[in-house]
Structure formats: C-alpha cells, structure tokens
Amino acid sequence: MLLNDIISGKLVDSVYIIAEIGQNHQGCVETAKKMIWEAKKAGCHCVKFQKSDLPAKFTRSALDREYISDHAWGKTYGEHKEYLEFSKDQYLQLQAHCKELNVDFTASAMDERSLEFLSALNVPFIKIGSGDANNFPLLKKAANLNLPLVISTGMQTMQTVERIVQTMRESGKEDYALMHCVSSYPTDPKDCSLQLISVLRTRFPNVAIGYSGHELGVIISQAAVLLGARIVERHFTLDKSQKGSDHRCSLEPQELKALTTAITNFKLSSVPMPPQEIVKKLNGDEELEAALQHVESKTILPCELPCRNKLGKSIVAARNLNKGYRLQLADMAIKVSEPSGLTAEDFLDLVGKELADNIGEDEPILGNSIIN
C-alpha cells in the first residue's frame, strides 16, 4: 500500500490523498457509496469515515443536552449523533464497496470501543483525530495494534506532540504518521500555520508528516505538499450547501479533482520548497502568504478553542467514587463531558490522588476535586 511506503520513508516523491467523508453522508449508506465513487473518480487513494461508540465517547449529560442548531438531526445531541452513526453491517457494506472500487477504506477511532471495532474490520490503517491526540490511554492501545496509525495534532501544543512521539517510541511503534492540523472550521489562512510542517519534519525526521486541512479552497493544501506533507486529508462533500456543520469547509468533487491533479503533477523531492518559491509557483496571493508566515512552535490557537471546548475530552468517573478515595486507573474514563473536567492528558497523573468530593459515575473530575 502506498501509505506504508510513505510512512516507512521508501517513497519521498508520492502523496497519499484521503477524502474525509466523515459524517457528510447525512446518515445515508447510499449517499456514502456515491461519495466513495466520486472520491475515487477524483483520484483519492482512501476514503475515511468517523466511528464512535456514543456511550464510550460521550457522558450521559453530553448526550442528553438539548441540541438547537440548523444542523441538528435530533432534539438532543445524542439523537443527533445517533442519526449519523452507521451500524456494523453498514460499515461492512461500505468496506466491500471500497474493495470493488479499489480504494482504501478506514475511519477515525473516536474511542476505545471504536478502535477495537475498526481493528476487527482489518482496515489498512487507523486514524486518531485531533480530539484524541492527548488521549494517551487510547494512543497506547492503538500503538499496540498491528496497524499503521495516522495521528492528527490539532488543538495540541508541541509538548503534547513530543509526548505522542515518545509514546509511540516506548510502544515500539514505527509505522505511524503525524498530521499538521488546525481545528477550526473553516480555517482562516492566517491560522493555517503551514510552516509547522517544516518544524515537525525537522523535529521528528524519522516520522512521516502530513496535512489535514480545513481551509476553503485547495491552494493551501497544495502548498502543504510542496513544504513536505506526504499525506493530505481534506473533508469531502457532494454539496457544500447541505445540512451539517462540516460541509462548508469540505471540498466538492470538482475541487477535490483539482487538488489531486495538481499534487500528481508536482515533481517532489525530499527537500521542501522555500515559501517564497511556493507562492510564485502557485501564483499565490496574500492569503497564501499568510498561510506560509513564519511559525516558531506549535501552540493551541485561539481559533481552536471553540472546537476544543465542544469536543475536547475530559477525565470522568467510571463509577461512583467517594470523598477520600485514592484514584486507580479503572476508576476513570476519558470522554467528551458536559461540563468539562481535567483534560485527558492528565489521566495517568491522577493515579493515587485523593478525592476531595464525592463524584458520581460519568461525572467529570475537576481540578478542585483532587487533593494535591
């Protein structure tokens, strides 16, 4: 598979292109099949979905909250998400359809149960989305699978990315890639921070670096390739005007085709092109220049905070816990919580800590719930 050769470093002049269907299928298998065909025609190597086990990913309060939005598919957030989830049989249908069309099929594992589900499907690789990039229990479990990993790094600091790489190294995992990503939908060009691709390539020379973009248009994604990204992922839709929050920052078929054609025509090497030359080559404007502005290091950007606040994961109680109890691993879970609690990154640090309050099952563990 092309992705394996890119991750291993055997190929430096090829790009693996992923069409992120996500949940833009509107909960319809036939629409998903049509999207797979359109992505194949556009020249993509892979189509990717998003797999969630809702009770494993969200707390009950997060699922039960009222969801008022023009994009809602249900009265509660749980009903909305359930409408967009495919069953195992439906995933098998889509996987078989991809096999017929000779296009890779996979999904993001949004929780540990979904990771197990995708592993059992024997997908060619598993994606770990930005919302789980600091979910180290999930990352460790994924690293122990005999499957390549593609890990997005939106909403994370460079310190967290370094910890991801350390986690992979400690697990003996070599077949993985890191994706530069900004979790803002759509991403303003000035926030795209494309130079982080070069920063990541320099910091982690033995790791394949890719780009997961949420900007409008295709020129910034083309620039990412010229900077050294060898995996490109873009959200894909049949129609940007459709109901659903991801459609606006997705590419329609003709845009996706334009992107794959441009990338295929690039003559690539292991040496990234300087930003000034990229702007000239692509006939870029001020927006491309803004996307290519100098960046010192990776931080959580202000534009990412809405997504982080909505979908960032917290540490919650896996069962009812009493005041004075000292936490063990089995007492905690990592979920999207309403309200939010301590971040997933703190999970292992809480082992042995004493609770200052009673905490009910599925309730978030807050900073003031811990006696330091």
Swiss-Prot record:
GO terms, molecular function: N-acetylneuraminate synthase activity; N-acylneuraminate-9-phosphate synthase activity
Annotated AFP-like domain residues: 314-372
SUPFAM superfamilies assigned to the protein according to its UniProt record, in alphabetical order: AFP III-like domain, Aldolase
The keyword Transferase is annotated on this UniProt entry: yes
Signal peptide: none
Enzymatic reactions: aldehydo-N-acetyl-D-mannosamine 6-phosphate + phosphoenolpyruvate + H2O = N-acetylneuraminate 9-phosphate + phosphate; aldehydo-D-mannose 6-phosphate + phosphoenolpyruvate + H2O = 3-deoxy-D-glycero-beta-D-galacto-non-2-ulopyranosonate 9-phosphate + phosphate
InterPro entries named in the record: AFP_Neu5c_C, AFP_Neu5c_C_sf, Aldolase_TIM, Neu5Ac_N, Nonulosonic_Acid_Synth, SAF
Pfam family, one: NeuB
GO biological process, one term: N-acetylneuraminate biosynthetic process
Role this protein plays: Catalyzes the condensation of phosphoenolpyruvate (PEP) and N-acetylmannosamine 6-phosphate (ManNAc-6-P) or D-mannose 6-phosphate (Man-6-P) to generate the phosphorylated forms of both the sialic acids N-acetylneuraminic acid (Neu5Ac) and deaminoneuraminic acid (KDN), respectively. Essential for biosynthesis of sialic acids in neurons of the central nervous system.
Protein's name according to its UniProt entry: N-acetylneuraminate-9-phosphate synthase
Lineage, top ranks: Eukaryota, Metazoa, Ecdysozoa, Arthropoda, Hexapoda
